[in-house]
Design a protein with these regions (language model features):
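Non-globular, low-confidence helical/coil segments that flank catalytic cores
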Residues: 2-12, 17, 23-157
């Protein structure tokens, strides 16, 4: 369990550091922040969605979509609408950093509105209604939440 929390903490620290760098460089207030990196044969776009206290990040690369957290219930429709405006129809990877309401509630809305291929989350159960809604929405897509071990590789983009 210690390794999983350590991995999650490292991932959160990396993503938040990236967010701070990009927001500092952009300096433009907006409901969503986008950074793109392009090379001769690939493009990756990272969208930081303003969902209040929580977090939501959309990463797009070569036609694939990764959603990291979804914000709280009050921002669920914003996240769904934003993804639709980005022409998202399928979420290849949905990642829940943890199951607090301000990170997972928006994922429920996305599960109810998009086809999802893979759901990745922390390896524990939380005794809350929003966690149960999340689990039910994952199951409705015929999926289970994956709990990868440190060092597990995934192909994206």
């Amino acid at each position: 369990m210690h390794h999983k929390l350590s991995f999650r903490r490292k991932l959160q620290t990396f993503l938040l550091s990236l967010l701070l760098i990009l927001l500092t460089a952009a300096g433009v207030p907006s409901a969503a922040y986008t950074a793109e990196a392009a090379s001769a044969d690939t493009t990756m776009a990272v969208h930081f969605l303003d969902v209040g206290q929580g977090l939501s990040i959309l990463v797009q690369s070569q036609g694939e979509n990764l959603l990291y957290d979804g914000g709280d219930r009050g921002h669920s429709s914003f996240v769904v609408s934003y993804l639709q405006k980005q022409n998202v129809s399928t979420i290849d990877y949905m990642i829940s950093s943890h199951y607090d309401e301000d990170h997972v509630a928006g994922l429920v809305g996305c599960l109810d509105n998009f086809s999802v291929k893979n759901v990745i989350g922390a390896d524990y159960v939380q005794d809350t209604k929003i966690y149960q809604s999340f689990e039910n929405s994952v199951a409705a897509q015929g999926l289970t939440v994956q709990h990868p071990e440190p060092g597990t590789d995934f192909t994206f983009g």
